[in-house]
Amino acid sequence: FTPWKYKAGMHFGWFQVTAFQHDKHVAAYGGGQTWTGPTLISSFPDKRYNATYLHQYYRADRTPPAGNIRNYPSAPWRGGMGSSHPYLFKWVEKDRTHSNQYNSQNVVAMRYAELLLMLAEISNELGNGQEMTFLTPVLTRAGLTPRAEYSQGQSSFRDAIMEEYQFELIGEGEDSFHNKRRGYQYFLDLSLIHISEPTRPT
């Protein structure tokens, strides 16, 4: 799942993360700042950011500065379908000299971080006071401290942990299980990102 011309060898297919999901992540952990442009984004406090999103690179078959590929948010104009959303970087072949069409990258079935998030969610629902014990290691690994929503009661924690699943596990195929557990109405109201600009590319 490597973007076009990101590596030397021919390849087919890649994933993109919607700009709206990207912006939701940035808003959650951006500290109230406006994070725009590649320079600011590269110093974003959430360490998961650069491991999750790819929005600017130079083609492997060109010598920089030629072949500069820019997607949102490095291309903030969002002028076309291809550049309107960042690529998902998790499954990209990181070796840019890789010349084969296929690689032997493992597919993750489940991660320890997901287990910790589930235990935090369960603890919150049980009201046993253990939720931060499980959540803190996930946030610490990402270089983060708990945001305010985690200390504003059970309902607020519930909504925040459902967002944390998205930020931590995006592109790993686990969304449907967590959405199903919460129910269809919760999915419609809080899990789906409501687009307020229907005329922009989606």
Feature annotation, model-predicted:
Residues 1-38:
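Polar, glycine-rich mid-to-C-terminal structural blocks
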